[in-house]
């Protein structure tokens, strides 16, 4: 008879240790009294979880910058040189390793020079998103006043503890301007005219910006390049960039979700010029939005979207199913990249991810792409972060879209009002993973049956990831089941649990969300783990995200 451990090894998915059962009958029913089981294999390290996986994305879109981050130096709203103080306070709790700016699509229409120099002399420009913004949107959403530029963004990063990640304009600015932007940010004090300009703005010391995106979604109207054409553009932009003795990490514009032809075309074109060309790329950007909830009925961008607040159990599972595709995308693009970049020098950078719903749930009128995140989005975000945690050898960075007042926001703000969304709470709960050693964990649970347009189907029963800091195990668990608890036995092998804490985010209403009027509808609850001489058993509530921090003997 096959040993139980060997059965688990063979049944688990190689990439993440996620066990999917094709039958509603539990294959482990006779092995444990609990309905579900998690086996943490502490000896099987997957790699170090880069804190950059917990990155963020800010763009001059809707109320992200103006009204979200930037309130102005003369505002009555508490601020630090114009930056919303309450936002900074909460961001420090999530340890934002890296923050991306100014886009996104906005980046390929942005001239960095417009956002430096005396604030009163900066030009006003038509925002790239002008045609998307609502007619009742504030003028700052449609016409960029450039009050928040490079200096202010770097100051924001320093206040919150994140590293800046700047995206260069490849569509409408020459490579020379990319070099000049790097010079403005990184040249030593007093060394160049641009260093003097930076000093005049209040920063004599260099910003030391390491991460630079070379364009954004260059396959689309932000370049309309073929992959071979973009490879030539990337080579030109990367041919010479001033480094000032410190390495720069250049991030290339990657595919539109599952477009493997873009990935192959880009890497083959680079390789034709020699291996050193591939080695000039630090990361390959991959974007994935879970937007199509039409269940195969349409691929239309507008008609396929679901509602952020009005959804049923089927819509719940369909969003998670769409989100889980990112793991397949990581695997397929990674495999293809390895055919050309055989040493896997280039890593994946998932610098845009999250759900994208149709308009209508915004709490601030005029914020066209603002969404109200619910418990569904919290579970989605936990699931996605767990996928990144389980792939630390492949994913070097990830950036949730977006930080505030747009799409999968961690925070919502308007004027003097501010609230942490369920997504923001998830990011704080996952902090213990940052910098930890990811270890393989096998999650076992009966699949969840549900009816999908008259046809029976299933969804997995538990999901999560595990990491270790010294003797401390961080284990995050998502229970996607909208109805049932999951009583789960947790095994850590020979290293027995001594003590621990458990933090759970859940709500009986899967539509629950936090608002300016009711800020604490969805909040995490923390308590001490009850650990005895018998097996550790934890009951995970329906539709929940849980973090366990366990001290091991």
Where do the model's predicted regions map?
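Non-catalytic accessory regions flanking glycosidase/transglycosidase catalytic cores in CAZymes
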Residues: 3, 7-21, 27-283, 326-359, ...
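Long, well-ordered, tryptophan-enriched scaffold segments
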Residues: 258, 280-311, 317
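Beta-strand-rich domain onsets/edges
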Residues: 321-322
């Amino acid at each position: 008879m096959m040993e139980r451990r060997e059965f688990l090894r063979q049944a688990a998915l190689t990439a993440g240790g996620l066990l999917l059962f094709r039958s509603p009958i539990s294959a482990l029913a006779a092995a444990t009294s609990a309905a579900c089981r998690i086996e943490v294999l502490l000896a099987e390290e997957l790699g170090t979880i880069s804190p950059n996986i917990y990155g963020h994305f800010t763009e001059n879109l809707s109320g992200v910058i103006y009204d979200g981050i930037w309130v102005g130096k003369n505002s009555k709203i508490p601020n630090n040189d114009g930056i919303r103080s309450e936002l900074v306070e909460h961001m420090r709790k999530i340890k934002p390793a890296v923050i991306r700016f100014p886009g996104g699509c906005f980046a390929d229409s942005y001239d960095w020079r417009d956002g430096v120099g005396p604030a009163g002399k900066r030009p006003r420009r038509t925002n790239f998103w002008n045609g998307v913004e609502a007619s009742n949107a504030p003028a700052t959403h449609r016409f960029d006043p450039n009050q928040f530029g490079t200096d202010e963004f770097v100051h924001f990063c320093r206040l919150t503890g994140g590293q800046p990640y700047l995206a260069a304009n490849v569509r409408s600015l020459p490579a020379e301007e990319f070099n000049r932007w790097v010079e403005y940010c990184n040249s030593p004090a007093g060394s160049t005219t641009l260093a003097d300009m930076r000093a005049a703005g209040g920063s004599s010391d260099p910003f030391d910006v390491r991460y630079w995106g070379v364009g954004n979604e260059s396959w689309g109207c932000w370049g309309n390049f073929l992959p071979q054409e973009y490879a030539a553009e990337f080579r030109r932009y990367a041919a010479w960039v001033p480094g000032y003795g410190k390495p720069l990490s250049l991030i290339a514009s990657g595919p539109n979700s599952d477009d493997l032809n873009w990935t192959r075309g880009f890497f083959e074109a680079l390789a034709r010029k020699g291996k050193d060309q591939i080695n000039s790329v630090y990361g390959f950007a991959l974007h994935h939005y879970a937007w199509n909830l039409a269940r195969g009925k349409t691929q239309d961008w507008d008609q396929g979207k679901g509602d952020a607040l009005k959804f049923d159990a089927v819509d719940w599972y369909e969003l998670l199913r769409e989100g889980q595709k990112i793991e397949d995308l990581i695997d397929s693009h990674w495999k293809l990249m390895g055919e050309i970049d055989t040493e896997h020098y280039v890593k994946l950078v998932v610098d845009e991810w999250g759900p994208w719903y149709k308009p209508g749930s915004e709490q601030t009128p005029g914020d066209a792409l603002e969404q109200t995140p619910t418990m569904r989005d919290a579970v989605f975000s936990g699931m996605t972060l767990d996928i990144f945690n389980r792939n630390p050898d492949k994913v070097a960075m990830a950036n949730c879209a977006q930080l505030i007042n747009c799409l999968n926001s961690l925070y919502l703000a308007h004027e003097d009002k501010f609230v942490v969304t369920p997504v923001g709470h998830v990011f704080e709960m996952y902090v213990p993973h940052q910098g930890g050693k990811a270890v393989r964990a096998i999650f076992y649970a009966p699949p969840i049956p549900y009816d999908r347009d008259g046809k029976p189907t299933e969804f997995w029963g538990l999901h999560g990831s595990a990491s270790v800091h010294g003797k401390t195990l961080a284990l995050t668990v998502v229970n996607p089941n909208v109805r049932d608890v999951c009583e789960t036995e947790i095994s850590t092998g020979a290293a027995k649990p001594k003590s621990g804490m458990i933090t759970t985010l859940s709500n009986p209403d899967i539509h629950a969300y936090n608002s300016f009027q009711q800020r604490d509808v969805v909040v995490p609850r923390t308590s001490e783990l009850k650990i005895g001489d018998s097996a550790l058993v934890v009951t995970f509530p329906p539709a929940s995200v849980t973090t366990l921090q366990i001290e091991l003997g």
